[in-house]
Amino acid sequence: MNLMLTLFTNATLASLLILIAFWLPQSYAYAEKVTPYECGFDPMGSARLPFSMKFFLVAITFLLFDLEIALLLPLPWAIQATNLNLVLFMALALITLLALSLAYEWIQKGLEWVE
């Protein structure tokens, strides 16, 4: 009963949000709206600065490794196994996979800022 109530509530809420988004007026972007505003003056230069692809790749790599560590920390409590050796083996396998991934990134020069 509890599961059915939760599913019904979630489906109703999702449908309600979809209907609200459908009926709300759409805002349209036009040339004046998307141009940068600098205190009423004409812009001196382009507001669209080039984005460093190296920074983006390092940031994505950091996020992946950070999420893996965040998943590794609560592993003993999440598994709740009676066999401690199994938990230690799984944690060691995950750490080994992370170390191999880091070594691969290092060898491929994925962590270098300047070439």
Swiss-Prot record:
Main location: mitochondrion
Membrane topology label: Multi-pass membrane protein
Alphabetically ordered keywords of this record: Electron transport, Membrane, Mitochondrion, Mitochondrion inner membrane, NAD, Respiratory chain, Translocase, Transmembrane, Transmembrane helix, Transport, Ubiquinone
GO cellular component: mitochondrial inner membrane; NADH dehydrogenase complex
Subcellular location as annotated: Mitochondrion inner membrane
Its EC number(s): 7.1.1.2
Chemical reaction(s) catalysed: a ubiquinone + NADH + 5 H(+)(in) = a ubiquinol + NAD(+) + 4 H(+)(out)
Pfam name, any one: Oxidored_q4
Coiled coil location: none
A molecular function (GO) term: NADH dehydrogenase (ubiquinone) activity
Family annotation (InterPro entries): NADH_UbQ/plastoQ_OxRdtase_su3, NDAH_ubi_oxred_su3_sf
A biological process from GO: mitochondrial electron transport, NADH to ubiquinone
General function of this protein: Core subunit of the mitochondrial membrane respiratory chain NADH dehydrogenase (Complex I) which catalyzes electron transfer from NADH through the respiratory chain, using ubiquinone as an electron acceptor. Essential for the catalytic activity of complex I.
Matches recorded under PANTHER family: NADH-UBIQUINONE OXIDOREDUCTASE CHAIN 3
Family: Belongs to the complex I subunit 3 family.
Assembly and interaction partners: Core subunit of respiratory chain NADH dehydrogenase (Complex I) which is composed of 45 different subunits. Interacts with TMEM186. Interacts with TMEM242.
Protein name: NADH-ubiquinone oxidoreductase chain 3
